[in-house]
């Protein structure tokens, strides 16, 4: 049974594109270094009686869904932690076929081997297909992209064909070029099956190809606010046909200061449109935006109503001083790189720190690359591609990559520098444990971060994580004014004793494996004993790494060509991810990691082999 019209051949070439950042680093994209983006756009005065009518409610409840009782629906929502607010919210769909998507959409879903809708898809699809405005609050990696893209395809198939000069029917606004690029990649596969066209426009890339896509006509446009405003101001596109608006990661767009641009863009769209807003958090600023842009909307919340992290992520917090971070990071990476699944993102606060840490790690033989807002788009794309394909399994990043970076098999996140807010902390660690997978987040928390300590403890408690006693001590010290300097934290030897003797765990990885296998009660008891003591040299000898593992630091960590224990995970005698000084010439010349092509943009900070120019 299918209540929707099948795909319709639009008869035009497919639009191509990939996303970039919405605004340039030097200011607005209008050509001026400073100014008011969108100042040339005039707020439209809409007369709904004069606008062409359009249809937006296509939902017909599947018979299997109609037979489901209210009690069964409530049980499902509780099991998936779905909270719904609003009037006349449809029942969630428990199976893909109950959504009645067109056959070619179902074919793509089948090829991707999805077993059942995620929670946000199950409840979001019926709402979106009913033509209702909605707010979806869900953690990253929850499947929200398909939650709005598949109803968008159904919506487009019920609208008149595009004519010459028409703008997009569906507009998706995203905060960063990385997120927009990933949305475009998802959209392209489904649009190809449905003979629709999508494109992505963003700053930091040539305008010509993006303008050509828009002139040919695209049904779906994924855009960052800055470049879209630039094109609207110079008349390269318009939003007269836009009847389906998506604000993806609305909280992030507000954090980045895009609210004025968003309001300018929304003023160009007819007020009877359908609007869907997606966010990982629900602060008052996002609530105000929803009140201004949405009408009689359904609010769907997945997970706890308060600030919460993905419960599939094991969170480990190490309270330490800034001067200790480098040594702790190296020892942690030695453990992580011994794993078969070792893809890791290390988050730092500044661009300078990103470059310095990347150079240091590569100089010491680690397969690390860095990404931040001052990198050229060509370099950023190349670095992300190397990371996604495992050629450089360590990515050092600023918050420019903390959202929108969707790599399925990231196993570890390390907060080298703690972010400015708990919201950013949640988004950072959300890069791991995508979909239903598990992951681990390590965080270095210093007394300088004391303003965030209470919020961090709340996030840990909500996720039923073990809480480092030092965090609780910082709360006490904050009240007594003893939070700064070494005097504000008790002797580290006590933690080392607790970890090595009472806890009985040799490494951070032992801690994780224990937490994964036992009850939350045991985990809570264990966490009170073990956090912070896992880096001492004593804990690395005669431990899980075998007798040939020596913990004197990175330059002596591989003394033999055939190490025993955990480090035998399929690695050859040269230790691909190791740091055997004998195998390193001038830092990186013998590393088996990819380098950009000679004609690629300069990769400052990455040592190049002979034959490659800097």
Swiss-Prot record:
The gene is Ddx5. This is Probable ATP-dependent RNA helicase DDX5. It is found in: Nucleus; Nucleus, Nucleolus; Cytoplasm. GO terms for cellular component: cytoplasm; nuclear speck; nucleolus; nucleus; ribonucleoprotein complex; spliceosomal complex. ATP binds at residues 114-116, 121, 138-145. Sumoylated; sumoylation, promoted by PIAS1, promotes interaction with HDAC1 and transcriptional repression activity. Sumoylation also significantly increases stability, and reduces polyubiquitination. Involved in the alternative regulation of pre-mRNA splicing; its RNA helicase activity is necessary for increasing tau exon 10 inclusion and occurs in a RBM4-dependent manner. Binds to the tau pre-mRNA in the stem-loop region downstream of exon 10. The rate of ATP hydrolysis is highly stimulated by single-stranded RNA. Involved in transcriptional regulation; the function is independent of the RNA helicase activity. Transcriptional coactivator for androgen receptor AR but probably not ESR1. There is a cross-link at residues 32, 45, 53, 340, 343, 388, 391, 411, 437, 451, 470, 523 (Glycyl lysine isopeptide (Lys-Gly) (interchain with G-Cter in SUMO2)). It comes from Mus musculus. Residues 1-39, 477-504 are annotated as: Disordered. InterPro entries: DEAD/DEAH_box_helicase_dom, Helicase_ATP-bd, Helicase_C-like, P-loop_NTPase, P68_rpt, RNA-helicase_DEAD-box_CS, RNA_helicase_DEAD_Q_motif. A motif (DEAD box) lies at residues 248-251.
């Amino acid at each position: 049974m299918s209540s929707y019209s099948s795909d319709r051949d639009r008869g035009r070439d497919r639009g191509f594109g990939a996303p970039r950042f919405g605004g340039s680093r030097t200011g607005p994209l209008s050509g001026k270094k400073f100014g008011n983006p969108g100042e040339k756009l005039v707020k439209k005065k809409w007369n709904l009686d004069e606008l062409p009518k359009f249809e937006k409610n296509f939902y017909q409840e599947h018979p299997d869904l109609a037979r489901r009782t209210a009690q069964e629906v409530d049980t499902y929502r509780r099991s998936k932690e779905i909270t719904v607010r609003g009037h006349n919210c449809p029942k969630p769909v428990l199976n893909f076929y109950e959504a009645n998507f067109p056959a070619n959409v179902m074919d793509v879903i089948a090829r991707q081997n999805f077993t059942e809708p995620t929670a946000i898809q199950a409840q979001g699809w019926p709402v979106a297909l009913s033509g209702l405005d909605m707010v979806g609050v869900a953690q990253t990696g929850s499947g929200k992209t398909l939650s709005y893209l598949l109803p968008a395809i159904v919506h487009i198939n019920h609208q008149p064909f595009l004519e010459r000069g028409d703008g997009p029917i569906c507009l998706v606004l995203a905060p960063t070029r990385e997120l927009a690029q990933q949305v475009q990649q998802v959209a392209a596969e489904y649009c190809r099956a449905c003979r629709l066209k999508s494109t992505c426009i963003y700053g930091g890339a040539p305008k010509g190809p993006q303008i050509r896509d828009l002139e040919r006509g695209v049904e779906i446009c994924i855009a960052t606010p800055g470049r879209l405003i630039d094109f609207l101001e110079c008349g390269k596109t318009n939003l007269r046909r836009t009847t389906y608006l998506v604000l993806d990661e609305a909280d992030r767009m507000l954090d980045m200061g895009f609210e004025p641009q968003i309001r300018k863009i929304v003023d160009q769209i007819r007020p009877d449109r359908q609007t869907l807003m997606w966010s990982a958090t629900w602060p008052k600023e996002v609530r105000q935006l929803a009140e201004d842009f949405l009408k009689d909307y359904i609010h769907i919340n997945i997970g706890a109503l308060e600030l919460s992290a993905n419960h599939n992520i094991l969170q480990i917090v190490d309270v330490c001083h800034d001067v200790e971070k480098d040594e702790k990071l190296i020892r942690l990476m030695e453990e992580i790189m011994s794993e078969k699944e070792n893809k890791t993102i290390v988050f730092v606060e500044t661009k300078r720190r990103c470059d310095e840490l990347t150079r240091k790690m590569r100089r010491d033989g680690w397969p690390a690359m860095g990404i931040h807002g001052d990198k050229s788009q060509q370099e950023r794309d190349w670095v992300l591609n190397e990371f996604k394909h495992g050629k450089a399994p360590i990515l050092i990043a600023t918050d420019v990559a903390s959202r929108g970076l969707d790599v399925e098999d990231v196993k570890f996140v390390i907060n080298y520098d703690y972010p400015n807010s708990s919201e950013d902390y949640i988004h950072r660690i959300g890069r791991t444990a995508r979909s239903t997978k598990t992951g681990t987040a390590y965080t270095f928390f210093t007394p300088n971060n004391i303003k965030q300590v209470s919020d961090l403890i709340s996030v840990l408690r909500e996720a039923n994580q073990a809480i480092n006693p030092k965090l609780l001590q910082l709360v006490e010290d904050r009240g007594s004014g003893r939070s700064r300097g070494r005097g504000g934290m008790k002797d580290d030897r006590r933690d080392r004793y607790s970890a090595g003797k009472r806890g009985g765990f040799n490494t951070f990885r032992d801690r994780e494996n224990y937490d994964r296998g036992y009850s939350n009660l045991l985990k809570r008891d264990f966490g009170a004993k073990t956090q912070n003591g896992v880096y001492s040299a004593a804990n690395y000898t005669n431990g899980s790494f075998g007798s040939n593992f020596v913990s004197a630091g990175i330059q002596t960590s591989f003394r033999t060509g055939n190490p025993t224990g955990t480090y035998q995970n399929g690695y050859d005698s040269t230790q691909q991810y190791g740091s055997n000084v004998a195998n390193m010439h001038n830092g990186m010349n013998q590393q088996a990691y990819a380098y950009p092509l000679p004609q690629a943009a300069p990769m400052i900070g990455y040592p190049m082999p002979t034959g490659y120019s800097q």
